[in-house]
Protein backbone atom coordinates (compact mmCIF):
# COMPACT_ATOMS: atom_id res chain seq x y z
CA UNK A 1 0.00 0.00 0.00
CA UNK A 2 1.22 3.50 -0.87
CA UNK A 3 2.37 5.54 2.13
CA UNK A 4 -0.25 8.18 1.25
CA UNK A 5 -3.10 5.68 1.66
CA UNK A 6 -1.61 4.36 4.89
CA UNK A 7 -1.41 7.88 6.30
CA UNK A 8 -4.95 8.75 5.26
CA UNK A 9 -6.28 5.55 6.84
CA UNK A 10 -4.43 6.29 10.07
CA UNK A 11 -5.75 9.85 10.17
CA UNK A 12 -9.30 8.64 9.59
CA UNK A 13 -8.99 6.00 12.31
CA UNK A 14 -7.70 8.63 14.74
CA UNK A 15 -10.31 11.20 13.63
CA UNK A 16 -7.60 13.70 12.72
CA UNK A 17 -7.17 16.13 9.84
CA UNK A 18 -4.18 16.10 7.52
CA UNK A 19 -1.54 18.81 7.77
CA UNK A 20 0.81 19.07 4.81
CA UNK A 21 3.60 21.66 4.61
CA UNK A 22 5.22 22.69 1.34
CA UNK A 23 8.85 23.75 1.03
CA UNK A 24 10.98 24.34 -2.06
CA UNK A 25 13.91 21.94 -2.36
CA UNK A 26 17.20 23.79 -1.99
CA UNK A 27 15.77 26.94 -0.41
CA UNK A 28 17.28 28.90 1.24
CA UNK A 29 20.31 26.61 0.76
CA UNK A 30 20.53 22.94 -0.24
CA UNK A 31 22.09 21.57 2.94
CA UNK A 32 19.06 22.68 4.98
CA UNK A 33 16.33 20.87 3.06
CA UNK A 34 16.54 17.38 4.57
CA UNK A 35 16.80 18.80 8.09
CA UNK A 36 13.74 20.94 7.36
CA UNK A 37 11.82 17.88 6.21
CA UNK A 38 12.59 16.06 9.46
CA UNK A 39 11.77 19.15 11.53
CA UNK A 40 8.37 19.49 9.86
CA UNK A 41 7.52 15.85 10.56
CA UNK A 42 8.59 16.30 14.17
CA UNK A 43 6.35 19.37 14.34
CA UNK A 44 3.22 17.58 13.15
CA UNK A 45 3.34 17.17 9.37
CA UNK A 46 1.45 14.17 8.03
CA UNK A 47 2.55 14.52 4.39
CA UNK A 48 5.46 16.52 2.98
CA UNK A 49 5.25 18.46 -0.28
CA UNK A 50 8.66 19.19 -1.76
CA UNK A 51 8.82 21.68 -4.60
CA UNK A 52 10.97 21.04 -7.67
CA UNK A 53 12.53 24.41 -8.60
CA UNK A 54 11.43 25.77 -11.98
CA UNK A 55 12.20 29.02 -13.77
CA UNK A 56 8.59 29.80 -14.76
CA UNK A 57 6.34 28.81 -11.85
CA UNK A 58 3.11 30.29 -13.19
CA UNK A 59 0.85 29.29 -10.29
CA UNK A 60 3.12 30.65 -7.58
CA UNK A 61 2.98 33.98 -5.85
CA UNK A 62 6.03 36.12 -5.05
CA UNK A 63 7.06 34.14 -1.96
CA UNK A 64 7.40 30.79 -3.70
CA UNK A 65 8.73 32.38 -6.89
CA UNK A 66 11.60 33.85 -4.88
CA UNK A 67 12.14 30.52 -3.13
CA UNK A 68 12.51 28.85 -6.51
CA UNK A 69 14.89 31.56 -7.70
CA UNK A 70 17.06 31.01 -4.62
CA UNK A 71 17.06 27.24 -5.20
CA UNK A 72 17.91 27.63 -8.89
CA UNK A 73 20.78 29.93 -7.92
CA UNK A 74 22.17 26.85 -6.14
CA UNK A 75 21.65 24.82 -9.35
CA UNK A 76 19.03 22.56 -7.78
CA UNK A 77 17.42 20.27 -10.35
CA UNK A 78 15.48 16.99 -10.40
CA UNK A 79 18.43 14.76 -9.51
CA UNK A 80 19.26 16.93 -6.51
CA UNK A 81 15.65 16.81 -5.30
CA UNK A 82 15.57 13.03 -5.60
CA UNK A 83 18.83 12.80 -3.66
CA UNK A 84 17.28 14.88 -0.88
CA UNK A 85 14.41 12.40 -0.67
CA UNK A 86 16.92 9.53 -0.55
CA UNK A 87 18.68 11.19 2.37
CA UNK A 88 15.37 11.76 4.16
CA UNK A 89 14.38 8.12 3.69
CA UNK A 90 17.48 6.91 5.52
CA UNK A 91 15.75 7.75 8.80
CA UNK A 92 12.08 8.22 7.85
CA UNK A 93 10.45 5.43 5.89
CA UNK A 94 6.84 6.28 6.80
CA UNK A 95 6.04 9.93 6.02
CA UNK A 96 4.68 10.38 2.49
CA UNK A 97 6.66 12.70 0.22
CA UNK A 98 4.94 14.41 -2.71
CA UNK A 99 6.96 16.23 -5.35
CA UNK A 100 5.16 19.34 -6.53
CA UNK A 101 6.14 21.24 -9.61
CA UNK A 102 5.79 21.70 -13.34
CA UNK A 103 5.92 19.33 -16.27
CA UNK A 104 8.91 20.73 -18.15
CA UNK A 105 11.74 19.50 -15.87
CA UNK A 106 10.17 16.04 -15.69
CA UNK A 107 9.59 15.92 -19.43
CA UNK A 108 13.26 16.74 -19.99
CA UNK A 109 14.25 14.05 -17.49
CA UNK A 110 12.08 11.46 -19.25
CA UNK A 111 8.81 10.24 -17.76
CA UNK A 112 9.76 6.61 -17.31
CA UNK A 113 13.22 7.32 -15.91
CA UNK A 114 11.85 9.98 -13.58
CA UNK A 115 9.12 7.71 -12.22
CA UNK A 116 11.57 4.85 -11.75
CA UNK A 117 14.11 7.06 -9.98
CA UNK A 118 11.45 8.83 -7.89
CA UNK A 119 9.99 5.60 -6.53
CA UNK A 120 13.47 4.24 -5.87
CA UNK A 121 14.28 7.40 -3.93
CA UNK A 122 11.13 7.09 -1.83
CA UNK A 123 8.73 9.52 -3.51
CA UNK A 124 5.05 8.62 -3.17
CA UNK A 125 3.34 10.91 -5.68
CA UNK A 126 3.45 14.10 -7.71
CA UNK A 127 1.39 17.24 -8.12
CA UNK A 128 2.08 18.66 -11.58
CA UNK A 129 0.49 22.07 -11.59
CA UNK A 130 0.40 22.60 -15.35
CA UNK A 131 -0.74 19.10 -16.34
CA UNK A 132 -4.55 18.98 -16.49
CA UNK A 133 -6.04 15.51 -16.04
CA UNK A 134 -7.45 15.48 -19.58
CA UNK A 135 -3.89 15.68 -20.94
CA UNK A 136 -2.26 13.39 -18.40
CA UNK A 137 -2.99 9.99 -19.90
CA UNK A 138 0.59 9.25 -20.96
CA UNK A 139 2.08 10.39 -17.67
CA UNK A 140 -0.61 8.56 -15.67
CA UNK A 141 0.15 5.25 -17.38
CA UNK A 142 3.85 5.58 -16.58
CA UNK A 143 3.15 6.60 -12.98
CA UNK A 144 0.78 3.64 -12.51
CA UNK A 145 3.40 1.25 -13.87
CA UNK A 146 5.83 2.38 -11.19
CA UNK A 147 3.32 2.82 -8.35
CA UNK A 148 3.64 6.60 -8.24
CA UNK A 149 0.46 8.52 -7.36
CA UNK A 150 -0.96 11.35 -9.46
CA UNK A 151 -2.52 14.04 -7.27
CA UNK A 152 -4.67 16.56 -9.10
CA UNK A 153 -5.88 20.06 -8.43
CA UNK A 154 -9.51 21.12 -8.30
CA UNK A 155 -11.06 24.49 -7.53
CA UNK A 156 -14.38 26.33 -7.13
CA UNK A 157 -14.59 26.59 -10.92
CA UNK A 158 -13.91 22.92 -11.70
CA UNK A 159 -16.76 21.54 -13.80
CA UNK A 160 -18.69 18.38 -12.95
CA UNK A 161 -17.29 16.81 -16.12
CA UNK A 162 -13.71 17.47 -15.04
CA UNK A 163 -14.44 16.17 -11.54
CA UNK A 164 -15.71 12.94 -13.10
CA UNK A 165 -12.49 12.70 -15.11
CA UNK A 166 -10.38 13.41 -12.02
CA UNK A 167 -12.24 10.73 -10.08
CA UNK A 168 -11.25 8.19 -12.73
CA UNK A 169 -7.55 9.07 -12.71
CA UNK A 170 -6.56 10.54 -9.33
CA UNK A 171 -4.95 8.73 -6.41
CA UNK A 172 -4.55 9.54 -2.74
CA UNK A 173 -6.24 12.90 -2.32
CA UNK A 174 -7.07 16.06 -4.23
CA UNK A 175 -5.48 19.47 -3.76
CA UNK A 176 -8.36 21.93 -3.47
CA UNK A 177 -7.24 25.38 -4.65
CA UNK A 178 -9.17 27.69 -2.34
CA UNK A 179 -8.50 30.95 -4.17
CA UNK A 180 -8.30 32.23 -7.69
CA UNK A 181 -4.84 33.51 -8.54
CA UNK A 182 -1.53 32.34 -7.17
CA UNK A 183 -0.15 30.84 -3.98
CA UNK A 184 0.00 33.17 -1.01
CA UNK A 185 -3.01 35.13 -2.27
CA UNK A 186 -5.37 37.34 -0.31
CA UNK A 187 -7.41 36.41 2.74
CA UNK A 188 -9.87 33.55 2.58
CA UNK A 189 -13.60 34.21 2.75
CA UNK A 190 -14.55 31.29 4.95
CA UNK A 191 -18.33 31.02 4.39
CA UNK A 192 -17.83 31.14 0.63
CA UNK A 193 -14.89 28.73 0.80
CA UNK A 194 -16.88 26.25 2.90
CA UNK A 195 -19.86 26.27 0.53
CA UNK A 196 -17.68 25.82 -2.55
CA UNK A 197 -15.54 23.17 -0.87
CA UNK A 198 -18.56 21.11 0.16
CA UNK A 199 -19.83 21.19 -3.43
CA UNK A 200 -16.56 19.68 -4.65
CA UNK A 201 -16.41 17.27 -1.72
CA UNK A 202 -19.78 15.85 -2.73
CA UNK A 203 -18.38 15.18 -6.21
CA UNK A 204 -15.08 13.62 -5.13
CA UNK A 205 -14.27 10.01 -4.33
CA UNK A 206 -11.08 11.15 -2.56
CA UNK A 207 -10.30 13.40 0.43
CA UNK A 208 -9.93 17.11 -0.41
CA UNK A 209 -7.06 19.07 1.13
CA UNK A 210 -7.30 22.86 1.06
CA UNK A 211 -4.29 24.86 -0.10
CA UNK A 212 -3.59 28.46 -1.13
CA UNK A 213 -4.12 31.15 1.49
CA UNK A 214 -3.55 29.22 4.75
CA UNK A 215 -1.41 31.66 6.70
CA UNK A 216 -2.10 31.32 10.45
CA UNK A 217 -2.94 28.59 12.99
CA UNK A 218 -6.38 30.16 13.43
CA UNK A 219 -7.04 30.03 9.70
CA UNK A 220 -5.82 26.43 9.51
CA UNK A 221 -8.20 25.41 12.29
CA UNK A 222 -11.14 27.25 10.76
CA UNK A 223 -10.62 25.49 7.44
CA UNK A 224 -10.01 22.10 9.09
CA UNK A 225 -13.42 22.32 10.78
CA UNK A 226 -15.00 21.34 7.46
CA UNK A 227 -12.08 20.18 5.28
CA UNK A 228 -10.19 16.89 5.26
CA UNK A 229 -6.91 18.71 5.74
CA UNK A 230 -4.87 21.81 5.03
CA UNK A 231 -1.73 22.57 3.06
CA UNK A 232 0.56 25.44 4.05
CA UNK A 233 3.27 26.79 1.77
CA UNK A 234 3.94 30.51 1.40
CA UNK A 235 3.46 31.29 5.10
CA UNK A 236 5.95 28.58 6.03
CA UNK A 237 8.51 29.72 3.46
CA UNK A 238 8.17 33.26 4.80
CA UNK A 239 9.05 32.03 8.29
CA UNK A 240 12.04 30.09 6.99
CA UNK A 241 13.56 32.89 4.93
CA UNK A 242 12.89 35.60 7.53
CA UNK A 243 14.69 33.54 10.15
CA UNK A 244 17.55 32.78 7.78
CA UNK A 245 18.02 36.40 6.76
CA UNK A 246 17.89 37.51 10.40
CA UNK A 247 20.59 34.92 11.20
CA UNK A 248 18.14 32.99 13.36
CA UNK A 249 17.32 29.28 13.21
CA UNK A 250 15.04 28.38 10.26
CA UNK A 251 14.39 24.96 11.77
CA UNK A 252 13.06 26.47 14.97
CA UNK A 253 10.99 29.06 13.12
CA UNK A 254 9.38 26.58 10.73
CA UNK A 255 8.79 24.09 13.51
CA UNK A 256 7.12 26.68 15.70
CA UNK A 257 4.66 27.70 12.98
CA UNK A 258 3.80 24.13 12.03
CA UNK A 259 3.46 22.98 15.65
CA UNK A 260 1.04 25.81 16.34
CA UNK A 261 -0.98 24.86 13.27
CA UNK A 262 -1.01 21.20 14.32
CA UNK A 263 -2.22 22.12 17.79
CA UNK A 264 -4.90 24.48 16.48
CA UNK A 265 -6.19 21.86 14.04
CA UNK A 266 -6.22 19.09 16.65
CA UNK A 267 -8.06 21.35 19.10
CA UNK A 268 -11.11 21.56 16.85
CA UNK A 269 -12.06 18.13 18.11
CA UNK A 270 -13.39 15.15 16.23
CA UNK A 271 -13.79 15.06 12.49
CA UNK A 272 -16.98 16.42 11.00
UniProtKB/Swiss-Prot annotation:
Residue positions of the active site: 49 (proton acceptor), 60 (proton acceptor)
Pathway this chain belongs to: Amino-acid biosynthesis; L-tryptophan biosynthesis; L-tryptophan from chorismate: step 5/5
Keyword hit for Magnesium: no
Reaction catalyzed: (1S,2R)-1-C-(indol-3-yl)glycerol 3-phosphate + L-serine = D-glyceraldehyde 3-phosphate + L-tryptophan + H2O
Record-linked InterPro entries: Aldolase_TIM (IPR013785), RibuloseP-bd_barrel (IPR011060), Trp_synthase_alpha_AS (IPR018204), Trp_synthase_suA (IPR002028)
CDD domains linked to this entry: Tryptophan_synthase_alpha
Gene Ontology MF term list: tryptophan synthase activity
Transmembrane segments: none
Top-rank taxon: Bacteria
Recorded GO CC terms: cytosol
EC top class, as a word: lyase
Record bears the keyword Lyase: yes
Pfam families (UniProt xref): Trp_syntA
Keywords noted in UniProt: Amino-acid biosynthesis, Aromatic amino acid biosynthesis, Lyase, Tryptophan biosynthesis
E.C. no: 4.2.1.20
Function, as annotated: The alpha subunit is responsible for the aldol cleavage of indoleglycerol phosphate to indole and glyceraldehyde 3-phosphate.
Family of the protein in this entry: Belongs to the TrpA family.
Subunit structure: Tetramer of two alpha and two beta chains.
HAMAP family linked: Trp_synth_alpha (MF_00131)
Name of the protein: Tryptophan synthase alpha chain
Organism: Legionella pneumophila (strain Lens)
Species classification: Bacteria, Pseudomonadati, Pseudomonadota, Gammaproteobacteria, Legionellales
Gene this chain is encoded by: trpA
